[in-house]
Amino acid sequence: MDKQSTFQDPKEKHRIQRDVKLSRPRKRFSFLDYVVVIFLTVVAFCVRAQRLMNPAKVVFEELRYYNYAVDYVNNKLLMDVYPPLGKLLFSLVAALTGNKYELNTLDEPGQQYPFTDVAYSMRLFTCLLGSLLVPLMYGTVYFPTKSKTAASLAALFVIFDNGLITMSRYIMIEIPALYFMSLTAFYWSVYEAQQKRPFSLRWHTSLLSTGVALGLALSTKLSAMFTFGWLLILAAFHLWNLLGDLSVPMYRIVKHLFSYIFYLIGVPITVYLAVFAVHSHIAYKASVADAFLPPEHRHALAGNRFDDQFADVAYGSLVTIRNAIPEHGYLHSSELLYPEGTEQQIISLVDEPNQNALWIIEHEHSQDNNRSNIELLKDGSVVRLRHVMTGRALHSHEHKPIVSNNDWQLEASAYGGFGFEGDANDLFRIQILEKKSKHATSNGTVETLNTKFRLIHVFANCELMSSHRRFPDWGDYQREVTCCRNCVERSTTWFIESNYHDGLPSDSRKITYRKPGFLESFVEHNKLMWLKDRKMGDGHVYESSALTWPLLLGPLRFFYEQHLQVFFMGNPFVWYSVISLVAFFVIVQIFCLARWNLGYNDFGPSAFHYNYNIGKFVVAWLLHWAPYILETDRVFLYHYLPALYFGIAALGVSWSFLGNAVFGNRTAYKALSVIIMALMFLVYRLYSPFTYMTTLTKSSCRALELKGSWNFHCNTYLDNLSDYKFSSDAGETYFEKAAPHPFVYSEDTAKKSEGDTPLNKNLNDYYPSWDQRVEAGYKLAAQQKAEQEAREAAEKAASEAAERSSSEAAASSSSESVAAASVEAERLAMEADEFNGASETVDGASVEAERSAMEAAALNNAAESTEVVGSSPESVASEQEENVAESAQARVE
């Protein structure tokens, strides 16, 4: 009786029917399914394609991908941090709709598209891929739920999300990448529907299709690695369940394991390699992007000719020296001087070799600089690098560099000139790096192209280094070179690219760059992608933290013109529904886990089925969102779209579960579904002016700023809709530029110094002029030395003449003193005669006469002594006074 009543219970009967329905494998869509899918896809396309060329100008990162497509059409190499498939697809559209010889790259965002039919076709292609997300979402939800209502609801969420619509309207790589990720999820859902029939043809084809789709996703954008990780987790979960099923023999588990390895690892890698093979076949011509490639890869491109070079490097060789980091370029100098500090000649790096990148290797002792005596460079050789065009030597000293200005770095400069041998601060020691010199000979000598070495300053013990900084305008924005202590080896590694020595026999061994194979080029390209992805520029005004994405805290403005704007803005109803579901699912899992620990089992077959399928999409949401939390540079709101897609899939499966487990009345369930669809459509319409760049009033715009972090720049719009009809003001054009790209040169870096003329292929052409300048320099130095010696001799003669003139002046002064003393003596003698004749004053006169006579005698003696020995004026005067006194005394007597 109880058993019969149980089967008559409507809820229990519905549960049993549901479990049977979910366990039955679904072979194909029904006719009604196809009708629904086609209808929804057409609606999605119409929603995305309206006003597609509004604006008909370059928007945000369209510039990058449009130019990439043009480069592919012209068979030029391009470098990007993303794999090539998405750009190849854009180039295919451009090639089919445009003239190869008329397509040119564009300069900046906001620029008018020269050929609107090409741009329209490329945007239409993105629009088509965005529309195809709808049938993929429908199938992804339908296969695990068998619910048309839930699948349709999820598809409508994709159709009317403003963010997905916006990204589907522009030439950007996000939608192609998302399309292949969603294709991977779709085929995995098809595969899981075949679990009851393992190793059948449909089982193999669905798993193979999953691997192919995953390979295409990885070939479009590396963020598909998150999808790859998600599939590995699901495959491991399936294997774990098989291990727990004792009815499954071990050989079948091993077959499952090898099937997963082949289809989910081997097939994607094969597809990835195939895409790069197509890329290498199409992009075979040289371009500005090849500066980032290692030299052997760069010179393998058409248009980059490189002549054979002498293998042996000797003193007297004329060389160009290149840093091991490809984009850092060639050691260079010119007439530019540091504006402060030592004010010596600047040492820098340039992207392309030119005459100012030529150096001649001199011996540390000038008397050994004889090119006819060939002495090869080896490990430990001490050299002086002389700049060919200016004659100055590479130099370093205890001065901090102006730009880097670090204590562990010293300034590198060029010092001296032709005819100046230089000083000890010009000397550098060569240290060969054996591990990096893979293809060099093992005889310990320096070999062109193959030997990697350091240049170590002999006295400062610092290493010549390529800096990551650039000079400002006074240094023509060239890359700085310093001499550093304890720095990164890669920045201090150099090699000689061009080498010529007129003393070497013409039949001497010569070498050139070897041509790398496909796998080597593949590895190098991917290594550059991974490395450069870590150096994506200086950020952007609209980059945001991934923690804010699920709550849609900040819209991203793409474009503004004539009081109209384009924003990347998601549908708040869709985005908040997704994050609410994720939060609710986590809470339910915690609650069920707590009950399970208490001995309760809340998971029957149906509940477990839904819990697994909701959980797998929540895990996908987490894997496609959480890694961006660790990123701090160049992360934008639209990077959340893959996570949003999987969140919508989880939402669709959850809605099916609610319909089966909660709503006993199917009519109420479907009515509520219609209400949700209507609310979603209403919110889409409210924010559509930001999607399609249509008119909006200031007041309506402000009403849409529901959160404090939303800023729609509402003052951009006019006060009334009628004002747009009469407004002749075109307004200011505004566009957001993408952040600087690591594989794109800025305009500043393209500047060249004066004298940076192209380098002749035959370096021997520079030897005659070099020898002439050296000879002229030494002649000038000898002439300057002779002139200096003549100046020194003249100065010495002038000094001696000045001394003689001073002595003669002193003697003349002494003669005048003697004459004055004689006059005084005669006067005293006359006075003495007068005293002699006066009898009444004889005694007093005698005393005075004696004194006067003594003074006169002293003066006379001094005068005689001065004439004989040339005494000083003071002594002469004293002796003269004594002589005069003696004479006067004699006369008195």
From Swiss-Prot:
Transfers mannose from Dol-P-mannose to Ser or Thr residues on proteins. Required for normal cell growth and septum formation. Shown to actively O-mannosylate wsc1. It holds the Pfam family MIR. One of its GO terms (molecular function) is dolichyl-phosphate-mannose-protein mannosyltransferase activity. Residues 310-364, 374-433, 443-499 form the MIR domain. The lineage of its organism: Eukaryota, Fungi, Dikarya, Ascomycota, Taphrinomycotina. Pathway: Protein modification; protein glycosylation. Its EC number is 2.4.1.109. This is Dolichyl-phosphate-mannose--protein mannosyltransferase 1. GO terms for biological process: protein O-linked mannosylation. The keyword Aminoacyl-tRNA synthetase does not apply. Residues 868-878 have a biased composition (Polar residues). It is found in: Endoplasmic reticulum membrane; Nucleus membrane. Residues 785-893 are annotated as: Disordered. Residues 786-806 have a biased composition (Basic and acidic residues).
